Amino acid sequence: MDITLMISAVVALAAGAVIGWLATKAHADQIRADLIEERRELDIELSAARQQLAQEAHWRSECELLNNELRSLHSINTSLEADLREVTTRLEATQQHAEDKIRQMINSEQRLSEQFENLANRIFEHSNRRVDEQNRQSLNSLLTPLREQLDGFRRQVQESFGKEAQERHTLAHEIRNLQQLNAQMAQEAINLTRALKGDNKAQGNWGEVVLARVLEASGLREGYEYETQVSIENDARSRMQPDVIVRLPQGKDVVIDAKMTLVAYERYFNAEDDYTREAALQEHIASVRNHIRLLGRKDYQQLPGLRSLDYVLMFIPVEPAFLLALDKQPELITEALKNNIMLVSPTTLLVALRTIANLWRYEHQSRNAQHIADRASKLYDKMRLFVDDMSAIGQSLDKAQDNYRQAMKKLASGRGNVLAQAEAFRGLGVEIKREINPDLAEQAVTQDEEYRLRSIPEGRQDEHYPNDERVKQQLS
């Protein structure tokens, strides 16, 4: 009985242990499954976190590149503003010099006018006041051409001064346009990589578009100071077509090429690691070097009819791409010069084109100044001839006045004058139709009688004029 109870107790105890172990195992399995599920979720979150960290690293790299380009653009903007201040200073000095010349011309014109008026007044003061209307009209016909030339000279000086004032106003407007263009170019530099993923033809068109904007902002006129896509046949009878030919004063030309490809720079800009970025950088430098050699072999300077300078401007349409290549390989400038090529970016090309535009403006001003000088020289010659003619007229008038006085003396002055003798005929009973001017005739007779009385000894006048009451009154 006791053994049976013990066995039953042992069996029950064993069964309970088995049941407990089974329950514990089931609970452990449940916990293990929960842990596995939780670990899987943690792995998913870890993978997402790693991807987010990779994206953040990429954006930090992109942000650093953009910050570098922004600092570069700020530096370029500072340099450009310094160049603008220098150009503005030179232009103001030139304008001041031109204004001084204009003031000198105006003063010279005023002095000539005053001298002419003084001369005319002196001549008119010595002229006979009884000159008839026909003589005055003759003088006016002589003075009118000179007056018209003086008025034309005054208008030309005023127009030149007004043009200078308008150019000063235009300069301030162009400076504002240049600042807006600089901001626009900076924005385009940030978005440019989206436009550089096409083929070489598309990139060449993009470069030509940027070049066209720079030319438009420079103030040069298409068809006058520059031409685009001009087709020229070389000595080998093959056609060459430079992108732009800029005309310079003194009959010179300069060629601009805008076909530089920037595919490697686009890969450099979008590279995600240093190795890829370095490889793209070397490819970009090699692309610039290859285009220098290709452009040098074209030998634009030898094209017939092209009065080109000894170098060609190789235009890189993206400012950061230009600065990156020269920063890593400064010797590219020397290599380009050996091939008669100058590397230019939008900023440096704009400064060069603005300088050319100013050269054209100074050329036009110089031609106008020469024209004014020629007109002034001709006016001076006309003035000299006019003064000589007026002097001759004055001498002729003086001589005519002397002849007039001599004739009037013979007519109505002195002893035996003509009018006195004519009046004597009238006293003898000669019939007349109309009397001579009574005042002049009386003066002539009176002077004739005075001369006669002076020639008669005193006390014997009555013997010669016994019945002449007028003579007696004169004697009394």
From Swiss-Prot:
UniProt keyword annotations, A-Z: Coiled coil, DNA recombination
Region (Disordered): 447-476
InterPro entries: DNA_recombination_RmuC
Ranges of compositional bias, category Basic and acidic residues: 449-476
Coiled-coil stretches noted in the UniProt entry, renumbered to this chain: 25-202
Annotated signal peptide: none
A Pfam family: RmuC
GO annotation, biological process: DNA recombination
Keyword Chaperone: no
Homology family: Belongs to the RmuC family.
Functional summary from the UniProt entry: Involved in DNA recombination.
NCBIfam families: PRK10361.1
Protein name: DNA recombination protein RmuC
Protein encoded by which gene: rmuC
